[in-house]
Amino acid sequence: MAETIIAPASPGGRGGVAVIRISGKEASHIGKSLCSSLPKPWSLKPCFVVNKQKEIIDQGLVAFFRAPKSYTGEDVVEIHCHGNPLIVDSVVSSGIFFGARLAEPGEFTKRAFLNNKIDLAQAESVADLIASETSQALRGA
């Protein structure tokens, strides 16, 4: 798990807020490249998210979670921005430019499992929650 990954942690489409997660050894470096600075661990602060030309993409919030006290067990940065797909794509593309790679579906949860943050039953429950299409399936997850 040497590579730092980035992906939206919120569902696709339009919405008021989107969460973009970065996880791995370079998460703080990439987060600083996108937001100029990070808050103290386990807190939020306002930020202007910028692209590789240092042009402002959006204004939002940034959170930092230091390993091992994060969802994945790695350093994690979460950027909370407006939920326009163009903004989300621009933030993710900029994170890739700064050194992350696009996460595969379920990869944040896979890392949490591999880093002993969750067990197999919990990982399967996360997948079931995300895939639930009925109230009954949601309760069963």
Name the predicted role of every residue range.
Residues 1-140:
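A glycine-rich (often HGG/GG-containing) alpha/beta subdomain
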